[in-house]
């Protein structure tokens, strides 16, 4: 600003300088000895032109300076807004982290209170508590607890020992006996019989494991038969039983993980002894080659085999014995399962999740990618809205059979069904993660209504026309045919008399002769003027011997 003021002052002094120059020029002109080729007017115009150009340039510089100041101020305001947004996001992230931390602490404290406050059966009169029940828990698992007589680290007197803590199984007391007897087969059958109550089972099995002498060995025993020795058959029931058994194996390993998470380091070292880990590693090494034949696309993110393998590594803490790259290849095979995020954390793969999510996106599993992005707080790197829109585009994309515009009706139905399923899946994902503000669901609901209406209309158009039912008749008397037709009537009902009688030819009407007809009086003889002889009256009985209401006789004409 000081330079600007100095330049302005110099420009203001230009007029005075010109006046001084004029005086000097007048003095020079007064001296006749000096001849000048220039006139004063020309010099004056020249200097005024210089003055105007300097002022114009000065104003241009001022405008540029103001523009620069405006841009600088806007940049500072934008920087402050971004800084405030970052601070707000950091604060929100810290609040979410604090909430999760508080929830985890509350869950841990609740579990500890539940275990500590659970009632323990008191000894009867005359009995004494076992010695290891009153010892301090830090002395129970001393170094001499694993000896030659107890190489597997079997927990002794676990029912009342503070090693495993207090426990109480309320809903299913049978679990205590099965776990106490180390009966893995019976445990499988019990879970299969009570599969409708899996939620309550999963709460009580970890407590029931405390009754087992070695819960880790019990779970490993339950894994026998996960891959049956006989070749799979086409028997659907057997396949369903195998799937149920595999789900039970996974649930038992998860329950064991819940039990182990509540133990201290010394107790954990006893339950997961070296022999137990070696046995688990042997099972995992036997399963690993069988996973190579699995197809990621065919598994559709819901592979029980891959889930069981990863859960085995996480539960028995043998992840370090296997390559990380091989484990990462199995994550997309279990991405649809609800335990996928927790399983990845247990395996120590949280830092590798961006690469896993990228693989899911490239393989068309955007919904699973969104779920994992929220689970690991990677929504800034992977936008959920963009992934959901990409999923809908994939759902509407044409298949190899053709394009939706010129496809056959069957292929068009397939396109519509795929889009309908995709829309419902996206809406469910939006509602689960509260993305309604970022991705409104009203247009999606409208599109679903259009597709369902078109589907219903097409279904009605392709259905065969059903014959219209006949109008119900009123109650009519039933008659039967002659004796020859009785045996041929398969319905067992008589013939229904139609609403209209047939037009009979009275001259040729048949009649029955016999005692019934003989009892009727003979008709009077007709006059001689008639040219025809009417048939004799036969009363109100017809040829089938059933009474009927005969119409009046026709008039005679003379």
UniProtKB/Swiss-Prot annotation:
Keywords on this record?
Answer: Coiled coil, Developmental protein, Differentiation, Flowering
Q: Which domain of life is it from?
A: Eukaryota
Recorded coiled-coil stretches: 9-102
GO CC annotation:
plastid
Kindly state a single biological-process term from the GO annotations of this entry: flower development
Give yes or no: UniProt keyword NADP: no
Cystine pairs: none
Supply the Pfam families for this chain.
Answer: Frigida
Does this UniProt record's set of keywords contain Phosphoprotein? no
Region span, Disordered: 454-494
Q: Give me the stretches of Basic and acidic residues compositional bias.
A: 454-463
What InterPro entries does the annotation carry?
Frigida
- Protein family according to the UniProt entry: Belongs to the Frigida family.
Q: What is the protein name given in its UniProt record?
A: FRIGIDA-like protein 3
**Name of the gene encoding the protein in the UniProt record:** FRL3
């Amino acid at each position: 600003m000081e330079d600007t003021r100095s330049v302005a002052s110099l420009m203001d002094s230009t007029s005075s300088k010109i006046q001084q120059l004029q005086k000097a020029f007048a003095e020079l002109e007064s001296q006749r000895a000096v001849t000048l080729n220039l006139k004063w007017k020309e010099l004056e115009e020249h200097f005024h032109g210089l003055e105007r150009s300097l002022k114009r340039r000065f104003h241009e510089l001022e405008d540029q300076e103001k523009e620069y100041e405006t841009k600088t101020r806007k940049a500072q305001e934008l920087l402050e807004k971004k800084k405030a947004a970052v601070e707000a996001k950091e604060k929100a992230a810290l609040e979410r982290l604090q909430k999760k931390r508080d929830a985890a602490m509350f869950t841990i404290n609740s579990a500890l209170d539940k275990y500590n406050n659970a009632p323990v059966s008191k000894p009867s009169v005359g009995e004494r508590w076992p010695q290891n029940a009153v010892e301090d828990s830090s002395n129970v698992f001393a170094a001499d607890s694993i000896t030659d007589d107890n190489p597997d680290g079997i927990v002794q007197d676990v029912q009342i020992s503070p090693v495993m803590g207090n426990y109480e199984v309320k809903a299913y007391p049978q679990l205590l006996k099965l776990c106490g007897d180390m009966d893995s087969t019976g445990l499988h059958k019990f879970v299969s019989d009570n599969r409708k109550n899996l939620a309550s089972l999963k709460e009580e099995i970890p407590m029931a494991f405390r009754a087992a002498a070695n819960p880790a060995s019990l779970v490993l025993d339950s894994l026998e038969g996960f891959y049956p020795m006989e070749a799979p058959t086409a028997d659907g029931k057997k396949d369903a039983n195998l799937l149920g058994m595999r789900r039970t194996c996974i649930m038992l390993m998860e329950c064991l993980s819940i039990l182990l998470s509540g133990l201290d380091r010394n107790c954990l070292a006893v339950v997961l002894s070296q022999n137990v880990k070696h046995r688990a590693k042997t099972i995992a090494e036997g399963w690993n080659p069988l996973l190579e034949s699995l197809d990621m696309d065919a598994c559709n993110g819901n592979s029980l085999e891959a889930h069981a393998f990863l859960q085995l590594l996480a539960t028995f803490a043998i992840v370090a014995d296997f390559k990380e790259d091989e484990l990462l290849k199995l994550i997309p095979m279990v991405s649809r399962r609800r335990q996928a995020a927790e399983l990845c954390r247990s395996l120590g793969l949280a830092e590798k999740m961006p690469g896993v999510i990228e693989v899911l996106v490239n393989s068309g599993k955007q919904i699973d990618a969104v779920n994992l992005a929220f689970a690991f707080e990677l929504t800034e790197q992977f936008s959920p809205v963009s992934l959901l829109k990409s999923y809908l585009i994939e759902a509407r994309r044409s298949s190899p059979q053709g394009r939706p515009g010129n496809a056959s009706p069957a292929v068009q139905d397939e396109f519509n069904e795929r889009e309908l399923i995709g829309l419902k899946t996206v809406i469910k994902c939006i509602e689960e993660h509260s993305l309604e503000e970022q991705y409104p669901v009203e247009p999606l609901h409208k599109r679903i209504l259009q597709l369902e209406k078109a589907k219903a209309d097409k279904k009605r158009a392709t259905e065969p026309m059903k014959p219209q039912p006949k109008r119900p008749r009123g109650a009519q008397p039933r008659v039967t045919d002659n004796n020859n037709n009785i045996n041929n009537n398969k319905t067992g009902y008589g013939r229904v008399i139609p609403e209209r009688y047939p037009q009979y030819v009275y001259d040729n009407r048949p009649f029955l002769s016999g005692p019934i007809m003989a009892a009727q009086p003979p008709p009077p003889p007709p006059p001689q003027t008639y040219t025809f002889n009417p048939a004799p009256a036969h009363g109100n009985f017809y040829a089938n011997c059933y009474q009927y209401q005969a119409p009046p006789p026709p008039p005679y004409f003379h």
